[in-house]
Swiss-Prot record:
Keywords: Cytoplasm, GTP-binding, Nucleotide-binding, Protein biosynthesis
Residue stretches spanning the membrane: none
CDD domains xrefs: RF3 (cd04169), RF3_II (cd03689), RF3_III (cd16259)
GO terms of biological process kind: regulation of translational termination
Binding-site positions, GTP: 19-26, 87-91, 141-144
Stated name of the protein: Peptide chain release factor 3
Annotated source species: Escherichia coli O1:K1 / APEC
Record SUPFAM superfamilies: EF-G C-terminal domain-like, P-loop containing nucleoside triphosphate hydrolases, Translation proteins
Functional description taken from the UniProt entry: Increases the formation of ribosomal termination complexes and stimulates activities of RF-1 and RF-2. It binds guanine nucleotides and has strong preference for UGA stop codons. It may interact directly with the ribosome. The stimulation of RF-1 and RF-2 is significantly reduced by GTP and GDP, but not by GMP.
């Protein structure tokens, strides 16, 4: 390994933000970029009525709904590091891409609305990070509002998400009385001054917990309350331990308000100091270290129509090892074909720029006219496939029906291509000619209907179907599997890649099937 490669690897940090809708993820994303000086006027995410669209809104439908469906990638410098932030759609309208993006990062930032605590979507996303024990940092947001008791919030995270909390900063007051935060490890208090939009206020720092200046700055009552709470915190919570953090067992917790531009930098300081540089990854034959000289990478997401003027698709590839250089020849392992990549892109939400070189942890965009699939591995010749980029069992299902029955062939072609791209999953029941599509977020269905029309000239509508969940099935005992298939034919379907799946009408129905056929494995995820 060259020393240049080692230095580039060491300074990269690649992370994503997980949160429930409206916990402030979009604001945090902007403020993170602001502190990294990537967006000069943060606050480009405006109310639904305004025409100044957020930096990461591409497709028409996003513009209509004021949400970011697309998982964009933003790179910015911070201190001596280069940080890659992968945006994860956070609205009710999120998709399987959100889950898969979490497989491409080395660390996650969990944003929690401190007035509400742990919410449903956060739980789901945390489950996905558990597949790889991804390290988690936590930001308790909206301290400029009235929040729940901070100790209660920590307890809730520990009990519900099964991860220990190690507070790094601690709030002084909240809402109208919010005065700032105390840093437990630096023994410093940062006094809150609201910075709105893109002004970052100079923050006044008071050294020492027992400094009389602290009482003068925040008032004696709040200063005493802080000292009392810290006694309790030190007794009741975890100390920060980097090893446990890297193992995904404890999360450092920061308090602040993204809207007020306060506290985000404390979290970023923690991120660049503690989060891992690009990590090794498993393939089906061996482990690949980031420091290896030979280039490797995998595709975790494909996005259609990022440029309204061009009907192209862009495949997002995470660089795992080596160095990408413009014009290099790479092998697409699935097809065993060599391709010259001369026009890879990097992204600063919405603006594409062509890249000359990229290192482990970076995300490249590859132009793709339907030849790249999710989970594809690219190498400099070695035949191996990265694992851990799964399909997730859909949670919502619809039947797709054609307005013109003669277009069945185009419909099937379109749906299979969209499923290879990860836009939706398609299931073809064995016992009838229905086409069932499965998704993780409601918006995926609208996207599919819109794309079938614009890209495949197929007019389709979707309607409800009596399906609650799906599981991929396999069984080591061929005879028992045949019996299972014979007796459950009406509930079996093939997915877009011709893998067999069990389509359950209810969770009870699924549990009964699992009890009745203990030798059959019902999988919630499936490797690409």
């Amino acid at each position: 390994m060259t020393s240049l490669l080692a230095a580039e690897v060491a300074k990269r940090r690649t992370f994503a933000i997980i949160s429930h809708p409206d916990a402030g993820k979009t604001t945090i994303t902007e403020k993170v970029l602001l502190f990294g000086q990537a967006i000069q006027t943060a606050g480009t995410v405006k109310g639904r009525g305004s025409n100044q669209h957020a930096k990461s809104d591409w497709m028409e439908m996003e513009k209509q709904r004021g949400i970011s469906i697309t998982t964009s990638v933003m790179q910015f410098p911070y201190h001596d590091c280069l940080v890659n932030l992968l945006d994860t759609p956070g609205h009710e309208d999120f998709s399987e891409d959100t889950y898969r993006t979490l497989t491409a990062v080395d660390c996650c930032l969990m944003v929690i609305d401190a007035a509400k605590g742990v919410e449903d979507r956060t739980r789901k996303l945390m489950e996905v990070t558990r597949l790889r024990d991804t390290p988690i940092l936590t930001f308790m947001n909206k301290l400029d509002r009235d929040i729940r008791d901070p100790m209660e919030l920590l307890d809730e995270v520990e009990n519900e998400l099964k991860i220990g909390c190690a507070p790094i900063t601690w709030p002084i007051g909240c809402g109208k009385l919010f005065k700032g935060v105390y840093h437990l490890y630096k023994d410093e208090t940062y006094l809150y001054q609201s910075g709105k939009g893109h002004t970052i206020q100079e923050v006044r720092i008071v050294k020492g917990l027992n400094n009389p200046d602290l009482d003068a700055a925040v008032g004696e009552d709040l200063a005493q309350q802080l000292r009392d709470e810290l006694e309790l915190v030190k007794g009741a919570s975890n100390e920060f331990d980097k090893e446990l953090f890297l193992a995904g067992e404890i999360t450092p917790v920061f308090f602040g308000t993204a809207l007020g531009n306060f506290g985000v930098d404390h979290m970023l300081d923690g991120l660049v100091e503690w989060a891992p540089a690009p990590m090794p990854r498993q393939t089906d034959t061996r482990t690949v270290e980031a420091s290896e000289d030979k280039f490797t990478g995998f595709v975790f997401k494909i996005q259609a129509n990022m440029d309204p003027k061009h009907r192209d698709r862009v495949a997002f590839m995470r660089v795992v090892s080596g160095k990408y250089e413009k014009g290099m020849k790479l092998r697409q392992v699935r097809t065993a074909k060599d391709v010259v990549i001369s026009d890879a892109l990097t992204f600063m939400a919405g603006d594409r720029s062509h890249v000359e070189e990229a290192y482990p942890g970076d995300i490249l965009g590859l132009h793709n006219h339907g030849t790249i699939q999710i989970g594809d591995t690219f190498t400099q010749g070695e035949m191996m496939k990265f694992t851990g980029i799964p399909n997730f069992a859909p949670e919502l299902f619809r039947r797709i029906r054609l307005k013109d029955p003669l277009k069945q062939k185009q419909l099937l072609k379109g749906l299979v291509q969209l499923s290879e791209e990860g836009a939706v999953q398609v299931f073809r029941p064995i016992s009838n000619n229905d086409l069932i599509v499965g998704a993780v977020g409601v918006l995926q269905f609208d996207v599919v209907v819109a794309r079938l029309k614009s890209e495949y000239n197929v007019e389709a509508v979707y309607e409800s179907v009596n399906v609650a969940t799906a599981r991929w099935v396999e069984c080591a005992d061929a005879k028992k599997f045949e019996e299972f298939k014979r007796k459950n034919e009406s509930q079996l379907a093939l997915d877009g890649g011709d893998n067999l799946a069990y389509i359950a009408t209810s969770m009870v129905n699924l549990r009964l099937a699992q009890e009745r056929y203990p030798d059959v494995q019902f999988h919630q995820t499936r490797e690409h």
